[in-house]
């Protein structure tokens, strides 16, 4: 339902920001 979709979008956003943080730390460009 709608709640599940919101949850999925939220999880995607969190995962994306974690990936961005991890990759910027790895490349040393934070």
UniProtKB/Swiss-Prot annotation:
Coiled coil: none
GO BP, sorted A to Z: defense response to bacterium; killing of cells of another organism
InterPro entries listed in its UniProt record: Antimicrobial_frog_2
Protein's UniProt keywords contain Disulfide bond: yes
Tissues where the protein occurs: Expressed by the skin glands.
Cysteines paired by S-S bonds: 24-30
Function text: Shows antibacterial activity against representative Gram-negative and Gram-positive bacterial species, and hemolytic activity.
Protein name: Brevinin-2Ej
Protein's organism: Pelophylax ridibundus
């Amino acid at each position: 339902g709608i709640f599940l979709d919101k949850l999925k979008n939220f999880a995607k956003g969190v995962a994306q920001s974690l990936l961005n943080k991890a990759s910027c730390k790895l490349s040393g460009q934070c």
